[in-house]
UniProtKB/Swiss-Prot annotation:
Residues 522-677 form the SprT-like domain. Changing residue 102 to R: In SPGFX4; uncertain significance. This is Germ cell nuclear acidic protein. It comes from the Eukaryota. Expressed in germ cells of the testis (at protein level). Detected in skeletal muscle, liver, kidney, pancreas, heart, lung and brain. Expressed throughout spermatogenesis, from spermatogonia to elongated spermatids, in normal adult testis (at protein level). Residues 27-36 have a biased composition (Low complexity). Changing residue 285 to P: In SPGFX4; uncertain significance. Changing residue 182 to K: In SPGFX4; uncertain significance. Residues 86-97 have a biased composition (Basic and acidic residues).
Length: 691
């Protein structure tokens, strides 16, 4: 195979003015896969694409996609041969093509599909399709041909540092199963890549061309839609290899951040089974190139995931499932074989055992990634997976049957809990003891209620209302006794020579003696008050007179100023004889009027019963506590000699003389006639007039 590939001459590009036939010759041996050769036809001439595939043993051919000229129709002719022999020259290939079309049918008449209406589709039968079922296996930015290598191309099995094998993509190249973000090809479309013979030509289609198996950005794949591009299996950031994506490329089942994979997206790049730090290959990835069976020093095994790579089954936030069609997708008939890949990641096979020997990456990183792969696989597994059921049964085992040591620990714990539960029981007993006193209190309250019932029964028997009975003498007597004691316990005056207390009881100032000794009584009260309350600021002698005309007024204080012989204030006090007919009334009235005189003579204030008067009134009560409180008005009961009574309302009107004419005056309340009540003495005997 290698010799055959080396001896193949490089195809010559036809001139643009002539019609040309482009032959794609694929040869494969055991456990190898050929690569597709694509040529760009002239833009203004009709072109024919010939795809010659030869297979032997377990080999897989690749599909050939050609971009038809923009203004003319193109045709694609596919030649499949099962023999291992291949044509080495351009003339032999053309002759073989003419022999096949011996029925006088020109190549242009076979399988003619206008490119303007719909992209041509080339169907190639391969015995062993790839995991993602893609015919074309190796596109390269520099267009590497598996049989006719270019100056910049590498051998199918011997990759160079900058070259990619038929199964190993370059850094800028994408697998046939992983389309670029800006272009979608089921095999390999690239925005900047051209045909396998031309450095700038694409293997299947240009920016506006569509591959035979994969539509362009504006075309929809049969299975997998993408936001910007649709790939049959996997989109790539820049380009995708047939089986192994590079740093920027994704595997057949691993989409990039912006691309949607059929089942598993990756943050940077995802491999179907083993992602690499810089590149992911379905079987073996290398830093610069990936070989189909031998991985480089920086390459990882198909089962060894990288730190930055995720499993093929782990979905990404921006990735879409292969079964979900895009808005621009049309075909929904061909599903992606994602379950096969998941089963390969879960079930160990002989190939995985061989690959594990080649995995030299650290076990810690691989174990971490393996955990992520298991998560992805479990998500993609169907509900009838045989491996998922044993895990559920194992989880149920500890609940159904507990081991002996666990039972012992639970028994110990139960015993501990019993000891812990005991104190609350004691507390409950304590609380019961606490609850008992309220019950006793309830009984006490019942005892208290019973006397009330007895009292109610008593009130029923007594004709007196229960309100009066409640106000029984037993309650009033102590209070009344206390009040009487307070009255009897009048404080004594500390002023020496004070005689104001019990003045009305003295014989000297009572009865007929009061009329003879009333002037002496008034002068003694004035001197005592001037000395104790006013601090002798009042004059020694003050005019205090008697007024017999004031019928209801007890006293009167007249204040003013005198300008002759010199300016001075003066005050004059008058006491009504008809109201003040006892020694105690003369005393209280005189003290009241002396407060007015002191406020004017000492302070020079005319405020009637204002603050100055109140000051002296409070001071007099403070110094002489035995005196009654000095107030503004008196409440004395006037002793009239003559009373007139209304015949209607029985109201009485007092008079000192019999001067009221009952024929002229009537009662003010009821307008009834007035009648004079006969005079009586103090003992109640009637006084008979002497006239």
């Amino acid at each position: 195979m290698d010799g055959c590939k080396k001896e193949l001459p490089r195809l010559q590009e036809p001139e643009e003015d002539e019609d040309c036939y482009i032959l794609n010759v694929q040869s494969s041996s055991d456990d190898t896969s050929g690569s597709s050769v694509a040529r760009r036809a002239p833009k203004r001439q009709a072109s024919c694409i010939l795809n010659v595939q030869s297979r032997s043993g377990d080999t897989s051919g690749s599909s050939v996609a050609r971009r038809a000229p923009k203004r003319q129709a193109s045709s694609v002719v596919v030649i499949d041969s099962d023999s291992d022999e291949e044509c080495h020259t351009h003339e032999e290939k053309k002759a073989k093509l003419l022999e096949i079309n011996s029925d006088d049918e020109s190549p242009e008449c076979c399988h003619v599909k206008p490119a303007i209406q719909e992209p041509p589709i080339v169907i190639s039968d391969d015995d062993n399709d790839d995991d993602n079922g893609n015919d074309l296996e190796v596109p390269d930015d520099n267009s590497d041909d598996s049989e006719a290598p270019d100056d910049n191309s590498d051998d199918s099995e011997a990759p160079d540092d900058n070259s990619d094998d038929s199964e190993a993509p370059d850094d800028n190249s994408d697998d046939s199963e992983a389309p670029d973000d800006n272009s979608d090809d089921s095999d390999v479309p690239d925005d900047n890549s051209d045909d396998s013979s031309d450095d700038n030509s694409d293997d299947s289609s240009d920016d506006n061309s569509d591959d035979s198996d994969v539509p362009d950005d504006k075309s929809d794949d049969s299975d997998v839609p993408d936001d910007s591009s649709d790939d049959s299996d996997v989109p790539d950031d820049s380009s995708d290899d047939s089986e192994a994506p590079d740093d920027s490329s994704d595997d057949s089942e691993a989409p990039d951040d912006s691309s949607d994979d059929s089942e598993a997206p990756d943050d940077s790049s995802d491999d179907s089974e083993a992602p690499d730090d810089s590149s992911d290959d379905s079987e073996a990835s290398d830093d610069s190139s990936d070989d189909s069976e031998a991985s480089d020093d920086s390459s990882d095994d198909s089962e060894a995931p990288d730190d930055k790579s995720d499993d093929s089954d782990v979905p990404e936030d921006k990735s879409d499932d292969s079964d979900v069609p895009d808005d621009n997708s049309d075909d929904l008939e061909v599903p992606v074989p994602a379950e096969d890949l998941c089963n390969e990641g879960q079930i160990a096979s002989d190939e995985e055992e061989l690959v594990e020997a080649a995995a030299a990456v650290s076990q810690h990183d691989s174990s971490d990634d393996a955990g992520e792969q298991d998560l992805g696989e479990n998500l993609s597994k169907p509900p009838s997976d045989p491996e998922a059921n044993p895990e559920v049964s194992e989880r149920k085992l500890p609940t159904e049957e507990e081991p002996a040591p666990v039972v012992e620990q639970s028994g110990k714990r139960k015993s501990k809990t019993k000891t812990i539960v005991e104190p609350p029981r004691k507390r409950q007993t304590k609380t019961k003891n606490i609850v008992e006193p309220p019950r006793k209190r309830q009984t006490k309250t019942k005892n208290i209620v019973e006397p009330l019932r007895k009292r109610k029964a008593k009130t029923k028997n007594v004709s007196v209302t229960p309100g009066h009975k409640k106000r029984g003498p037993s309650k009033k007597k102590p209070g009344a006794a206390k009040v009487e004691k307070r009255k009897t316990r009048t404080p004594k005056c500390k002023v020496p020579g004070c005689f104001l207390q019990d003045l009305e009881k003295s014989k000297k100032y009572s009865g007929k003696n009061l009329k003879r000794n009333k002037d002496e009584l008034v002068q003694r009260i004035y001197d005592l008050f001037n000395r104790s309350v006013c601090d002798k600021k009042l004059p020694e002698k003050l005019r205090i007179g008697w007024n017999n005309k004031m019928v209801k007024t007890a006293g009167l204080c007249s204040t003013g100023e005198m300008w002759y012989p010199k300016w001075r204030r003066f005050a004059k006090i008058q006491i009504g004889l008809k109201v003040c007919d006892s020694a105690d009334r003369i005393r209280d009235t005189l003290i009241h009027e002396m407060c007015h005189a002191a406020s004017w003579l000492i302070d020079g204030i005319h405020d009637s019963h204002g603050d100055a008067w109140k000051y002296y009134a409070r001071k007099s009560n403070r110094i002489h506590p035995e005196l009654p409180r000095v107030t503004r008005c008196h409440n004395y009961k006037i002793n009239y000699k003559v009373h007139y009574e209304c015949t209607g309302c029985k109201t009485r009107i007092g008079c000192y003389t019999k001067s009221l004419d009952t024929s002229r005056f009537i009662c003010a309340k009821c307008k009834g006639s007035l009648v004079m009540v006969p005079l009586t003495q103090k003992d109640g005997t009637r006084i008979v007039p002497h006239v």
